[in-house]
Amino acid sequence: MILSYFGDGGFRLQSGDLSLLVDPPNNRLKADVVLKTLVSTEMTAPEVGEIAFPGEYEVRGIEISGIGVTEESTDKYLKTIYLVRWDEMSFAFLGHVKDVPSIDILEGLNEPNILFLPVGGGHFMSPQDAAKVAKKIEPNLIVPAFYKTPTDFLKAMGQKGREEEKLVFKKKDIITDTGKVLILKTNN
């Protein structure tokens, strides 16, 4: 599997000829499945291959659970957290979350192999809150998103982190890690 980062909350996972894209920063990026963690409540129907709402989905062997973040959603915007199961691994995308999710939501994420976490503060989780969430969820790898620099998050985690252009991996490559931070360089 290949993991790439496109800035902000934009990530692509690819396994063979199948790809999943989360919060694409532009319309040029294409994938078989697109997840949106923040959408306008005026959106009536997502495009083909796009998932933008809470619910249970299965697309070409990828199992997706969308969990609505009602505490942060408004009459204009809906926020969704996704848990993705694919190739015997699980991936949790917290997207545009600002506050620490409820215990029920955190327990529902069930120790994902990779946690994608907003860490930049402001409209997103503070680095300190993000570190608390990461330590509670206990993923193998943590990939920060929505930040200017990862310094404050790395400090809160007590790590230096490892930086990569992209991550090429199989489950056996990451299951021995516990709570390791991976900083991905932006691919534009």
Where do the protein language model's features map onto the residues?
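A contiguous pocket-lining binding segment that forms or flanks enzyme active sites
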Residues: 111-145
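Alpha-helix boundary/capping residues
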Residues: 38, 137, 157-160
